[in-house]
């Protein structure tokens, strides 16, 4: 199961005593700041969590899987995430929930 923004808002409501509206606004504002920074070409560093980076990919040859026709895959910018050491360690030592 995936963690959603709604669940994050609910956790903030329960743990910090924020109103549901304020908790939702805080989550939205956080993600909007991450989006804004990436749109402006900035790296996003979240200490203890990881880094969001932008990477430019060059045009490359590809193939249409249905027809087998060779087609160019256009150059584009992609977002990558590199987890920090603290996050890696915690995930590796966590016991999976079933």
Curated annotation (Swiss-Prot):
Entry keyword Nucleotide-binding: no
Q: Where is this region: Disordered?
A: 49-70
InterPro entries named among the record's database cross-references = Hist_DNA-bd, Histone-like_DNA-bd_CS, IHF-like_DNA-bd_dom_sf, IHF_alpha
Q: Which UniProt keywords apply?
A: DNA recombination, DNA-binding, Transcription, Transcription regulation, Translation regulation
DNA-binding as UniProt keyword: yes
Q: Which GO terms describe its cellular component?
A: cytosol
Q: Which GO terms describe its biological process?
A: DNA recombination; positive regulation of metabolic process; regulation of DNA-templated transcription; regulation of translation
* Molecular function terms from GO: DNA binding; structural constituent of chromatin
**Which superkingdom does the taxonomy of this entry point to?**
Bacteria
This chain's function reads: This protein is one of the two subunits of integration host factor, a specific DNA-binding protein that functions in genetic recombination as well as in transcriptional and translational control.
Question: Subunit details for this protein?
Answer: Heterodimer of an alpha and a beta chain.
Q: Which NCBIfam families match?
A: himA (TIGR00987), PRK00285.1 (NF001401)
Which family does the record assign?
Belongs to the bacterial histone-like protein family.
Q: What is this protein called?
A: Integration host factor subunit alpha
Protein encoded by which gene: ihfA
């Amino acid at each position: 199961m995936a963690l959603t923004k709604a669940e994050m808002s609910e956790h903030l409501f329960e743990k910090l005593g924020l109103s549901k509206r304020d908790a939702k606004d805080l989550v939205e504002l956080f993600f909007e700041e991450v989006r804004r920074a990436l749109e402006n070409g900035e790296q996003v560093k979240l200490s203890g969590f990881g880094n969001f980076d932008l990477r430019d990919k060059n045009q490359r040859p590809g193939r249409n899987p249905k027809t087998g026709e060779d087609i160019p895959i256009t150059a584009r910018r992609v977002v990558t995430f590199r987890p920090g050491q603290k996050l890696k360690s915690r995930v590796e030592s966590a016991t999976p929930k079933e």
